């Protein structure tokens, strides 16, 4: 019983109208089919009367045929009109659905705008930007400090590696030359032998410069 007194929605009304239009279209199609059948019968009667030489009967039947064909033409016009109405109904239904969707969206936007405070939102964004800049500055300072520490450590390690390399090379050369030097039991080497077996300061300095150590 509740459904009998329920208020019809726009969709319900449009659905009923489309149903009626479809019924009207089917009725027009049936009427046209009947007219076409009657048209063929009249044509056969006219031919029959013409063969019999009955001109008056042919004249009367011809007038009926003209009226019937006019009526059949009207059915096409009415059918076209019904189709147009059905199309318009569908367009209206689509437009009303779009309007309903826009109305719902507008209400949602209105509710959101009521909850939002533009001034407060702007202040929040400004605070975020300010704190973000502070964080970036702090991060940059920390990175610079760490870079300085590690760069200095790397420089010291690199310098020490170079010095060790030079000393190793010098040690290898000294060992090689001292292996050829005479032992203490055979007496001290002469001045010329000492000069040839040892490494001069100039040679050490030259090797250091070659490795980039000042």
From Swiss-Prot:
Q: Name one GO cellular component term.
A: cytosol
User: According to the UniProt entry, which residue ranges have a biased composition of type Polar residues?
Assistant: 189-199
Q: How does it sit in the membrane?
A: Peripheral membrane protein
Annotated disulfide bonds: none
Q: Which InterPro entries match?
A: Snf7_fam
What positions does the record give for the motif labelled MIT-interacting motif? Answer: 202-212
Record's subcellular location:
Cytoplasm, Cytosol; Late endosome membrane
Q: Which Pfam families match?
A: Snf7 (PF03357)
Disordered: where is this region? 178-203
Q: Which GO biological process categories is it annotated with? A: protein transport; vacuolar transport
Which controlled-vocabulary keywords does the entry list? Coiled coil, Cytoplasm, Endosome, Membrane, Protein transport, Transport
Identify the main location.
Answer: cytoplasm
* Coiled-coil segments: 16-55
Q: Could you give the subunit structure recorded for this chain?
A: Probable core component of the endosomal sorting required for transport complex III (ESCRT-III). ESCRT-III components are thought to multimerize to form a flat lattice on the perimeter membrane of the endosome.
**Similarity field:** Belongs to the SNF7 family.
Outline what the protein does. Probable core component of the endosomal sorting required for transport complex III (ESCRT-III) which is involved in multivesicular bodies (MVBs) formation and sorting of endosomal cargo proteins into MVBs. MVBs contain intraluminal vesicles (ILVs) that are generated by invagination and scission from the limiting membrane of the endosome and mostly are delivered to lysosomes enabling degradation of membrane proteins, such as stimulated growth factor receptors, lysosomal enzymes and lipids.
What's this protein's name? Answer: Charged multivesicular body protein 2b
Q: List the source organism.
A: Xenopus tropicalis (Western clawed frog)
Lineage, highest ranks first: Eukaryota, Metazoa, Chordata, Craniata, Vertebrata
